[in-house]
């Protein structure tokens, strides 16, 4: 009986690590297209004043536009995903608070409650950040 409880605890902790990793990585993926956008922004600025570099300037300007719009619309998509995931965490939080099995799940029930609330708050905060940056970009 004791080993079964220990196994359940290990299974739970492995699952929570995967979910926790997803909640930390997902909001930051939107930054990936931003780095090349910054590079091509400065490159097009330098080439703008360079005589005879019209073709290179247009190429850099088009690449900047591509990565900029990818970052902006990617931010909008991630904002929607974050709201969905945060809502799922909120439902899990409510289930843990008001569920019958919360009192019996003493070894990891309260830790799960704190982790779920923290993930919900983090995702909600990142949603507001991405919604603000998307609104400023449009």
Regions from the PLM with identified roles:
Residues 22-41, 80-89, 117-126:
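Canonical alpha-helical transmembrane segments of integral membrane proteins
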Residues 2-73:
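Membrane-associated alpha-helix detector
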């Amino acid at each position: 009986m004791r080993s079964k409880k220990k196994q359940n605890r290990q299974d739970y902790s492995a699952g929570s690590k995967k979910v926790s990793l997803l909640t930390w990585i997902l909001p930051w993926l939107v930054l990936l297209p931003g780095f090349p956008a910054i590079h091509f922004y400065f490159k097009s600025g330098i080439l703008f004043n360079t005589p005879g570099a019209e073709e290179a300037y247009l190429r850099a300007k088009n690449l900047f536009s591509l990565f900029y719009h990818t970052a902006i619309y990617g931010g909008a998509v991630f904002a929607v995903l974050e709201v969905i995931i945060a809502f799922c965490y909120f439902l899990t939080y409510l289930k843990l608070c008001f569920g019958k099995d919360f009192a019996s799940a003493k070894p990891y029930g309260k830790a799960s409650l704190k982790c779920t609330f923290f993930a919900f708050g983090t995702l909600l905060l990142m949603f507001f950040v991405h919604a603000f940056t998307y609104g400023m970009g449009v």
